[in-house]
Regions:
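A broad, structural surface signal
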Residues: 7, 33-36, 53, 57-64, ...
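Extended, H/D-rich, highly charged conserved domains that either
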Residues: 1, 40-159
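A short acidic-Thr-Gly-centered motif at the start of a beta-strand
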Residues: 31-45, 101-104, 178-186
């Protein structure tokens, strides 16, 4: 069931969060170094895109530790909502003393989770990201917030599941999978693959 699957994802996160401090710090430092190696770029090149099929939040945890901003399709802060807009939003700043020449903010990457996430939840017609701490024991207590209307682990947006043939060709997955070929065909887009 989705409840068992979400529990196994949370167990893997908890294993990292509760590991011996030296081992955890060493592993997270490797992750931070990896993420920052391609989050920085020259001002004329497009943002890097990170695509992952993973349901856990290890990349998000590493990005948070590194101070890396991840641009995904969620808008908002308290309970972000998924937007299918393809607007190419970015983060810029104006250097002191220079007007009219905004520059790209360093430490920003585009981020797409192709198969959903343990903290994505279907609420009526919307997809929300809930505030689920990294390494939490169970998702259920975090689904009891106002506005979630009797949500349970069965409403988590984790794929593939038994209904994947139908659901992955619908919102939000069709939008997420469109982002992949769009990023692949842009210039200066390196590929890093792992696993098999």
């Amino acid at each position: 069931t989705l409840e068992d699957f979400s529990k196994s994802i949370l167990d893997s996160e908890a294993g990292i969060a509760r590991a011996d401090e030296d081992k955890r710090e060493q592993a997270l430092n490797v992750l931070v170094t990896f993420l920052m190696s391609f989050a920085s770029r020259t001002g004329v090149r497009a943002r890097r895109n990170i695509f992952t099929p993973n349901y856990d939040r290890l990349i998000e945890a590493g990005a948070e530790l590194a101070g890396l901003h991840l641009l995904d399709r969620f808008l908002g802060n308290l309970m972000p909502i998924f937007r299918s807009s393809r607007l190419d939003l970015d983060m810029h700043y104006n250097p002191p003393g220079i007007r009219g020449e905004p520059r790209y903010l360093e430490g920003v990457a585009r981020f797409t989770k192709l198969h959903g996430s343990v903290d994505w939840l279907q609420v009526d017609r919307d997809i929300r990201r809930v505030g689920l701490p990294f390494g939490a024991d169970d998702v259920a207590p975090y689904l009891q917030a106002p506005g979630l209307k009797g949500a349970s682990a069965h409403k988590l947006m984790i794929y593939p599941n038994a209904a994947k043939d139908r659901e992955t060709s619908d919102h939000p997955y069709v939008e997420l999978f469109r982002d992949l070929p769009a990023a692949v065909f842009r210039p200066h887009g390196p590929w890093i693959t792992y696993g098999g």
